[in-house]
Amino acid sequence: MAMFEQMRANVGKLLKGIDRYNPENLATLERYVETQAKENAYDLEANLAVLKLYQFNPAFFQTTVTAQILLKALTNLPHTDFTLCKCMIDQAHQEERPIRQILYLGDLLETCHFQAFWQALDENMDLLEGITGFEDSVRKFICHVVGITYQHIDRWLLAEMLGDLTDNQLKVWMSKYGWSADESGQVFICSQEESIKPKNIVEKIDFDSVSSIMASSQ
């Protein structure tokens, strides 16, 4: 994380003003993307600037860097970063490997086909080379979805959704989110009733408004 913090300040200066779109800064920004991947850090603004520079300078397009940007965007689900990044990549490059595979993985995650996601990822593990913390970041997103969707879930299903975790690995994630399991194999997620917070709506009506209504009704 030390290298990331050092580069962050420098990159922040590069992204100010018109210099943001100077192609001479691409090498620095691309190294910054690689540092994010290695140190499990993230800077969406800088990554979008890289993709914008690729749009303006197609000859400088780097497939590997773009793939890293997309994978980092996936680690920030449920935020819309992945969609933002995808929209800045032209159709021809979207058809290239490994970008095509990453877009497919993103589609599986966004549509909550979690078991299919892990299966597809297992067949393309080379995509994660140089990417630190990707799988656990995805598991955080899946736990977020489970937390707002389920009250109870089968233990075996939860393990599958999180990537075929072992029993001990599953216990770690359950403990992290305060989930408990009973003897029947059911995991208690939360009571939806406890999650519902009523809103008190108060409308302030001044005297002039009331008097005008009363006058019009007479």
From Swiss-Prot:
Pfam families linked: CSN8_PSD8_EIF3K (PF10075)
UniProt keyword tRNA-binding present: no
Protein name per the record: Eukaryotic translation initiation factor 3 subunit K
HAMAP family for this protein: eIF3k
GO biological process, one term: translational initiation
N-acetylalanine, modified sites: 2
Phosphothreonine PTM positions: 28
